[in-house]
């Protein structure tokens, strides 16, 4: 019997953060580093908990080199060879603690993951990524990976509801990726009608995860630094970015020049372009659930990173949070019908 949930579910665009009295004198006083101890791996983390998405146009070794300078994290896409991993590890040993090796559920993916982690023991994070984290097959896969790598920290997803967050944590995952369909080049919601507004998903999933001493990543839906701050305010331990980090020198994707302007290709990993590149095309039984866009070339990613971090620091000063850790406790969301004056501005 179909059921309608009448509870209002909200996205980042539906809210603003209410300002509160603050004792902070300057944005420079804000500490954006977080330290976590993970439930299943028993490992610890310290850094600025923003992650470059495991897309081949974002989660690149070139991106990782820059992000690790700021103590940010990179989920490296799964299409690098073992030789490429070894070459990067040899040249950039200081970056390895800020990286995850990614894998799908396929046997070839898992075999390569094993080879990478055996060859480069300094990599302690695994990102298990599927479009639909609700399948029993994926739960069993997480259990198998935990059994094989008992001391590695496992990120797993994607899901959007508390009960599945709990099941994945109890199956061996440490950090759950939250988000179905909010990404800028994801078309899952249009193709399938399935999804969940990201702000509400983060709030509900964070509550479920934290009750089990687990953690979550808000994956997708951010279009500006304010959205990243809202995700942290909603309870996300980490925020994963794709579109905001696309189009840079360090991003993957072909560089195109047209009419004197430069663009970089950016596409979803379930797009027709990605499937042609890695699977020989879209299988007869499925549809593409991603799109390809041309992002105006933005130059070095360092400027974008500073803009994002500066925005979050400013958020913290507005709500009186001296540390990023305090942001969710200082957050009160107010529902709005408009966020910005649109006369001279873009969407965000």
UniProtKB/Swiss-Prot annotation:
List of residues binding K(+): 181, 183, 186, 189
Residues annotated as binding GMP: 219-221, 242-243, 268-270, 286-290
Active site positions, chain numbering: 186, 188
Effect of residue 289 to Q: Loss of enzyme activity
One example GO MF annotation: GMP reductase activity
Stored Gene3D superfamilies: Aldolase class I
Residues the record lists as binding NADP(+): 26-27, 78, 129-131, 180-181, 269, 285-286, 314-317
Listed SUPFAM superfamilies: Inosine monophosphate dehydrogenase (IMPDH)
Cleaved signal peptide residues: none
Class of this enzyme: oxidoreductase
Modified residues (N6-acetyllysine): 291
Keyword NADP annotated: yes
EC number, as in UniProt: 1.7.1.7
Keyword GTP-binding: no
GO cellular component terms listed in the entry, alphabetical order: cytosol; GMP reductase complex
Keyword annotations: Acetylation, Metal-binding, NADP, Oxidoreductase, Potassium, Purine metabolism
Effect of residue 188 to A: Loss of enzyme activity
Family: Belongs to the IMPDH/GMPR family. GuaC type 1 subfamily.
HAMAP family per record: GMP_reduct_type1 (MF_00596)
Protein name: GMP reductase 2
Organism the protein comes from: Homo sapiens
Lineage: Eukaryota, Metazoa, Chordata, Craniata, Vertebrata
